[in-house]
Amino acid sequence: MSDAVTDADGSSAQSHAQSAGHHAVQGHGGHSQGPLLKLAVGAIGVVFGDIGTSPLYALRDTFAGHHKLPLDLLHIYGIISLMFWSMMIIVTFKYVSVIMRADNKGEGGSLALLALINQHTDGKRWGRGIILLGVFATALFYGDSMITPAVSVMGAIEGVAVYRPDMHPLIVPLVVGILIGLFFIQSRGTEKVAAFFGPIMLVYFGTIAVLGALSIAEYPPVIAALSPHHAVTMFIADPWRGFLAMGAAVLAVTGAEALYADMGHFGRSPIRMSWLVFVLPALVLNYLGQASLLIRNPAALESPFYYLAPEWFQWPLLFIASCAAVIASQAVISGAFSVTQQAIQLGFIPRMTIKHTSTAAGQIFIPVINWALMIAVILLVLVFQRSSNLTAAYGIAVTGAMLIDNFLLAVVLFKLWQWKAPAAIAMLAVFFAIDAAYLGANMTKIPDGGWVPLVMGIAIFTLLTTWSRGRALMRENMAEGTIPLDVFTKSAHSSAARVSGTAIFMASTAAGVPSALLHNIKHNKVLHERVVILTVSIEDVPYVDEGERYSVKDFGNGFYRLTLRFGFLEETDVPGALKGVSMCGEPFNMMKTSFFLSRQTLIPSDKPGMALWREKLFAWMLRNAASAMEFFRLPTNRVVELGSQLKI
């Protein structure tokens, strides 16, 4: 694990983490304000969009997808049983009951979990393996972020062709138009419309529950499909096709990790309550209703979700489902912004321009991510054309991330919670068996589109690990021959002229003299009255207490070493943090303070460390990283950049 980044940005990343979950658009700490019911409604609007829109295509694709099952009672009952118990074991037990207990100062999500784990595994030989798994899950998350908006919106809009077959040629243009509009409004922020997400999703879940219940009433015996023995019977009678069908059945639990990822925004109790009391029953009723419809009318397989509606309600259902799909897509896009911000802080991704669309924490817009996602999503729609084709690509990213979560959970159980081995192993064995089976079933869909998230994942994993490794090599090379600060201050105090004001030199580590200071002495031959060597440290916690915000060491003669600490969910507002520093001489006056940054130009070489092509890739990423001045919110007219060359 690294403990710093480079002089170029002066920050120190003390942990690396990953994410495979979605993050909400709400601010941190929301669960401490307002009544439980209000927070539960908010959670329904953000957390459950992905899993909530699964009924649009999950059951249909089990019987009409790439690995079709016979449409008979054995397989209908078996799949409904499999979906129900998957939701109970994976979502309700694994995520809601177990993983949601593993919070990092109230924050959830795999990034927060990995940062928490790092505190207990730093320096361990196997710790790096856990980190790499986490990084790969982050890469899979980005693949998921590309597929979810495409499959959700397309799955909803395909209802147009169900009711009006002559409008089928308009589906792809409609989907592309909606998605382009969705990505274009991101820069304006979604705070004003976000207040409607909860009520709209309440209407959606209420609607699918009622439609499902009405269909169940037409064939009440379908309720028996909830018994686990029907899934077992199906696998015994038809093991191979049952296994292949798991590739589509897993669609019923996509988005499960969002419950954990958004815990910091809404709190554990509101999410649990909304899932157990409202969302889960609505999903179960709808899946049972679709099963009842297929038993009574096999021709409804074209779209059992939409054929549940009576004729007079068909277009209203299409509108409600389309709104739900857009909301689900919005939650994923906001999650991609949130994960990227955390990954930047934790040292996995180069600095990017981050724009705040609201005063509320978490309301951010990252242009590079937004436009990259938009291009990828539209390409997926144009290439795959139908949601049933896209679902083949969907499952691998989801099941891969879920399997990796088991490894992270294992560390939590043994290292953090100190569980006894028999209980931990028994529970983990169940989780690993289920997730591995689902992943194996989805691997059979690689030729049908499953290769898409794998290729995306490997490409993004390469970028993330190249950046992380490149920064580590830079730190190692810069540390070679570093002059101790106490030695430097004794000689510099007597040999350089002093000028009025304060100079802050951004440093990557809390040891040695930063290259910007050495270059300033070499070229300008002066020192300011007060010289502060500043390191920004990103901690393994989401938020740092104000009492632990900074530490100062006074070297005398106007020399100070200052460390500012930020959590991985906080903005690195250096001028704002400096206002609270009281042990570094007189208070900081930004108009009398100059910030000195060092900008390295990398020269790829044949030195050991990374392959030459990765060194060139890293150099390109570094050149295109956002300005440290902007990232740390430094006043533009008070910054001096000094260049240097560095071989890696």
Swiss-Prot record:
Record region (Disordered): 1-31
Residues passing through the membrane, by range: 39-59, 73-93, 130-150, 165-185, 193-213, 243-263, 275-295, 317-337, 364-384, 394-414, 421-441, 446-466
Main location: membrane
Keywords carried by this UniProt record: Cell inner membrane, Cell membrane, Ion transport, Membrane, Potassium, Potassium transport, Symport, Transmembrane, Transmembrane helix, Transport
Pfam family, one: K_trans_C
Domain of life: Bacteria
Reactions that this protein is recorded to catalyse: K(+)(in) + H(+)(in) = K(+)(out) + H(+)(out)
CC per GO annotation: plasma membrane
Molecular function per GO: potassium ion transmembrane transporter activity; symporter activity
Keyword Cell membrane: yes
Family statement drawn from the similarity comment of this UniProt entry: Belongs to the HAK/KUP transporter (TC 2.A.72) family.
Name this protein carries in UniProt: Probable potassium transport system protein Kup 1
Phylogenetic classification of the source organism: Bacteria, Pseudomonadati, Pseudomonadota, Alphaproteobacteria, Sphingomonadales
Gene name in the database record: kup1
